[in-house]
């Protein structure tokens, strides 16, 4: 099984008023080339897709275009994206039902009730030729306030 792991893209980040869009686009093209060459079974993106929790429309389009290109480069690959501390978990998940049609699983929040965590959302199968060859346990960035019943001492 081959897994490609990446994180901390920070799309939309500027450095002292220097627009980094060109280098971010170059990174996404390079990532797509790697996926094309390596044909991994899964790609895991572990948070901080965006630098700001409310990214500009152009930044969101850059992400969407990149994920579609990556999917086209390796249509059978399972893609897992988790939210990081810079991402808005709810905004990242907003199109998750649509993304699933492209083999992309977005986990922005930990789904829980007062009694339990919904693990089904977090356990993602990696399939190869219609059979399960592994699993990814997708856990987004967790804030202590998400678990008020935990003893913090």
Language-model segments: residues:
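N-terminal active-site segment of His-dependent metallophosphoesterases
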Residues: 1-68, 75-76
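His/Asp/Glu-rich metal-coordinating catalytic cores
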Residues: 87-153
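Proline-centered loop/turn at the N-terminus of a beta-strand
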Residues: 2, 78-80, 105, 135
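Metal-dependent catalytic neighborhoods of phosphoester/phosphodiester hydrolases
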Residues: 15-16, 49-67, 83-102, 106-108, ...
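Short, charged helix-to-loop "capping" segments that act as catalytic/coupling loops
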Residues: 70-79, 113-115
